[in-house]
Amino acid sequence: VTPDKWLRVWNERHRDTPLTLLQAPAAEARDLLVGGGADAGLVRLPVDRAVLSAIPLYTEQTVVVVPRDHLLTAVDEVSPEDLADDIVLHPLDDVLDWERGLPGRPALERPATTANAVELVAAGIGVLVVPLSLARLHHRKDLTYRPLKDAPESRVALSWPEAATTDQVEDFIGIVRGRTVNSTRGRTQAGTGGKPAERKTGAGGKSGAGRT
């Protein structure tokens, strides 16, 4: 996923319609899109398919964030069993689906946000399991991370309001999919009165949102 490239290509093709990139917490992404605060955005699946269309883009790796002097830094990959003796922090804005339960020992209280949890990891209070992009977003020199196997994964999609599928949104979808300027796919053909079926191929850290 290369938002900077999408922005560059958009500005080359739509010089009179600037594209602005925003950042929003995953929990706020749906309301931002539905409320018209953004035309399209990168969100974590699942989304409410009654109001949002989505195109799955990729599945993100899950990692465990630990202090740089933690014992787990001695291995290249961590298993849930390796966390048995650690307090695993579970922030209220966690984007992972722990159907089988969180590994390790639970904290007495759940941090309000992922950012708060990262501060607690730095203080040596516990470790944190997050998608890779969130580990990078909250990077600190005193922390590092390792891939966590057999953990829930987060799927990321490009999403937009079903009722607001404009030609500009269709053009942006085409850019995300790597289509050339001469491609007619991704935009409703003149006179068909329909919407392209490919918009319905998908089903919500930070989420990126675009506003034209």
Predicted segments — roles?
Residues 54-62, 66-88:
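Flexible hinge/capping segments at coil-to-helix
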Residues 18-25, 91, 104-116:
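Short beta-strand-to-loop elements that line the ligand-binding cleft
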Residues 5, 146-199:
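A late-sequence structural motif
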Residues 34, 44-52, 114-143:
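A ligand-binding cleft/hinge motif common to bilobed small-molecule-binding domains
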Residues 201-212:
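Intrinsically disordered, compositionally biased tail regions
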Residues 16, 37-38, 125-126:
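Short, high-confidence coil segments that cap the C-terminus of an alpha-helix
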Residues 6-9, 13, 27-62, 143-146:
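Short beta-strand-centered segments that line the small-molecule binding cleft or hinge
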Residues 3, 76-110, 166:
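Secondary-structure junction motif
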